[in-house]
């Protein structure tokens, strides 16, 4: 029925009309066909909320007051919840707001692997682990698409650096692609049923991703049976014939000469001249029409399409829920947290990030937030009343051009470099101003009962188009933290950032709380956790290393090169490498503390048959032995006995459970054959491997609480 309807429309379209549907006719829209009631496709950036309205043919915010929206926590924050239900809730907010703003496609979520902590867009991505990405991207897509909006999962594939992203050739072996870089996208297609997917800027093994037959035609269309729409990243197409023959459906660009795009007039001419088959154009239009039909943009269900809503109270509650579970208590010696802010006490909040807002920066992730509660606002709002809260910036941020004024997309095809320059502030050197700010902060700290430092990064560093030079904290923050810890040893250090940073003071700090960019209610959530109103339950979705020299992308492979980047580390990405090499990292993958305590007991591992296939049932008991209700994420790792050239273990399942004080619950997961498989380059598929496996259950990749062995034999092994 659906395909018949599509074919009937296709017969009515002229070649010119079909060409008009497969390239941009505005910066964020395509051309419709009014005579056949085919509307344009309206798209929006959206990793952290629906982006502001842009002019059709100019990279300029149109200046309306109707595009203020809910500001969601970034994908790194969502991943840190380890909560599938919250990932879906975030998707629901994004999808409903996109519809409310009249959008058909939201360009989200981003799921590229966090290969290096220096990638400028890591805050837009979820994790270093493909399995965790799979588990969270599927419900997020479902949440978006329940609102008759297409999710557009990006960037396919291996877009793990910003340096020379348009032209860098990413060299990755087949096994690493299949086991690390493809699984998130495959799950998005096969399980999440994403209606759209964005091709990446970079080349992959010599082919531009948006014009790659092996990537789009073979892997995506043939192997994964994707029948949705492939959209190019803006300006990622470079050849008419290659684009026409690949599985790309829609070319978008940063330039305003829409008819000059490769899949516009040049393609029209090539088809008319007999150089390119019109059937290739038909297939692209067919995919677009299919998506439109599923979105109720056309067809008999058109009048039943959801209308959406934005800036609702329900959305604000949802993003607060996500923010609360995203924050990670990295360290808490001597029970410094939660704070005991008694009546009449003096609280010092120090650090420029305490008063900063982040919604208006980062590149295509920027939005016009209806509001944003900063950490300082959140602390003042919660403590208020009889507690005196004072603020000092502690360090100075040099003036830079407002992020909202920077034309990120228009500059996306240019090479940018991250450089540091000397600055002056009010006629004095930056160093002089920094020393004044430091002295003011230390004096305030000494005069206070409680000291909270809020530092980290901002979108000068976590930003599209640039990779960081190193993991160091900017603006002399290490000096500020050292001075505060010396003056007040119980100073609570809060980091607000989009990617890991060096923490040379970590051994001295008693309490460290980490927050990714946590959305419009981030400051509220931070204050609730500091005060104990909310018990932290976030876990790291990436390893926090001490500095970039520990990262295999830098020591074994290459990162940040401008022409060719070699992923020589293969599957040894993130904790797979660090745990195998017993690297002394700062905080391991999966780590995150609570104000209560949990114990694991009674591990049971049972081999069983399901639908003719062998599975392994893993169960254990988890008890809250502390005095507060809390949530724990139970992580299950599989460790093969034969480890040659393989990670020592890999995450294969997890469950997040809420427990009242003294409560015990039984956790049960089913491991399937794929969880004991390796990619076979001869058979071109994952193959289960016979042998002895250790099943590890724990609170992080290095905090293994229970383990047991099982011998497995697979018919295909």
Task: Briefly describe each language-model feature range.
Residues 1-681, 685-702, 709, 714-717:
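Glycoside hydrolase catalytic-domain context in secreted enzymes
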């Amino acid at each position: 029925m659906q395909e018949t309807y599509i074919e009937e429309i296709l017969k009515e379209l002229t070649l010119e009309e079909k060409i008009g549907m497969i390239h941009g006719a505005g910066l964020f829209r395509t051309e419709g066909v009014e005579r056949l009631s085919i509307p344009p496709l309206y798209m929006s950036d959206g990793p952290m909320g629906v982006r502001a309205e842009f002019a059709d043919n100019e990279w300029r915010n149109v200046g309306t007051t109707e595009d203020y929206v809910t500001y969601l926590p970034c994908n790194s924050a969502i991943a840190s919840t380890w909560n599938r239900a919250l990932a879906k809730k975030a998707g629901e907010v994004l999808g409903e707001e996109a519809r409310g703003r009249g959008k058909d496609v939201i360009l989200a979520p981003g799921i590229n692997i966090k290969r290096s902590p220096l990638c400028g867009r890591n805050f837009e991505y979820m994790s270093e682990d493909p399995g965790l990405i799979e588990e969270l991207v599927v419900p997020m897509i479902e949440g978006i698409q329940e609102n008759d909006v297409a999710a557009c999962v990006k960037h396919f594939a291996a877009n793990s650096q910003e340096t020379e992203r348009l032209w860098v050739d990413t060299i990755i072996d087949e096994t690493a692609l299949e086991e690390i870089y493809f699984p998130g996208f495959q799950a998005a297609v096969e399980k999440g049923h994403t209606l759209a997917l964005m091709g990446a800027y970079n080349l992959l093994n010599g082919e531009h991703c948006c014009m790659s037959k092996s990537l789009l035609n073979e892997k995506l269309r043939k192997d994964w049976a994707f029948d949705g729409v492939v959209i190019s990243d803006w300006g990622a197409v470079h050849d008419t014939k290659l684009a026409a023959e690949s599985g790309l459906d829609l070319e978008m660009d940063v330039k305003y000469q829409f008819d000059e795009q490769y899949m516009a007039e040049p393609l029209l001419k090539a088809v008319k001249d007999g150089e390119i088959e019109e059937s290739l154009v038909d297939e692209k239009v067919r995919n677009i029409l299919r998506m439109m039909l599923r979105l109720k943009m056309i067809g008999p269900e058109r009048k039943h399409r959801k209308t959406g809503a934005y800036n609702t109270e329900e959305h604000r509650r949802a993003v607060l829920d996500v923010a609360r579970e995203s924050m990670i208590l990295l360290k808490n010696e001597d029970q410094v947290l939660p704070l005991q802010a008694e009546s009449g006490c003096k609280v010092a909040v120090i650090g420029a990030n305490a008063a900063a807002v982040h919604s208006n920066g980062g590149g295509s992730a920027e939005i016009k937030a209806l509001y944003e509660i900063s950490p300082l606002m959140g602390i003042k709002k919660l403590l208020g009343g009889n507690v005196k809260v004072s603020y000092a910036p502690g360090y100075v941020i040099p003036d830079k051009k407002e992020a909202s004024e920077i034309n990120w997309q228009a500059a996306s095809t240019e090479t940018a470099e991250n450089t540091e320059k000397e600055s002056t502030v009010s006629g004095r050197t930056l160093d002089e101003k920094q020393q004044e700010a430091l002295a003011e902060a230390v004096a305030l700290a000494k005069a206070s009962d409680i000291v909270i430092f809020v530092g980290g990064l901002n979108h000068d560093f976590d930003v599209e188009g640039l990779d960081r030079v190193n993991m160091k904290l900017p603006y002399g923050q290490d000096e500020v933290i050292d001075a505060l810890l010396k003056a007040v040893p119980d100073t609570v250090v809060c980091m607000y950032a989009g990617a890991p940073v060096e923490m040379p003071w970590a051994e001295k700090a008693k309490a460290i709380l980490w927050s990714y960019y946590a959305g419009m209610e981030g400051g509220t959530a931070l204050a609730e956790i500091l005060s104990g109103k909310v018990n932290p339950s976030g876990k790291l979705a990436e390893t926090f290393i001490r500095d970039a020299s520990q990262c295999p992308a830098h020591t074994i492979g290459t990162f940040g090169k401008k022409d060719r980047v070699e992923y020589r580390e293969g599957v040894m990405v993130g904790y797979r490498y660090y745990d195998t090499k017993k690297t002394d990292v700062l905080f391991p993958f999966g780590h995150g503390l609570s104000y209560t305590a949990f114990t694991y007991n009674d591990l049971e591992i049972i081999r069983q048959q399901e639908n003719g296939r062998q599975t392994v049932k893993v169960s254990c008991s988890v008890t809250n032995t502390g005095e507060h209700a809390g949530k724990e994420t139970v992580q299950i790792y599989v460790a093969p006995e034969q480890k040659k050239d393989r990670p020592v273990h890999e995450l294969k399942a997890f469950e997040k459970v809420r427990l009242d004080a003294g409560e015990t619950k039984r956790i049960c997961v089913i491991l399937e054959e794929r969880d004991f498989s390796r990619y076979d380059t001869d058979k071109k598929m994952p193959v289960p491997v016979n042998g002895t496996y250790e099943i590890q259950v724990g609170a992080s990749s290095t905090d293994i609480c229970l383990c047991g062995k099982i011998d497995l034999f697979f018919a295909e092994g």
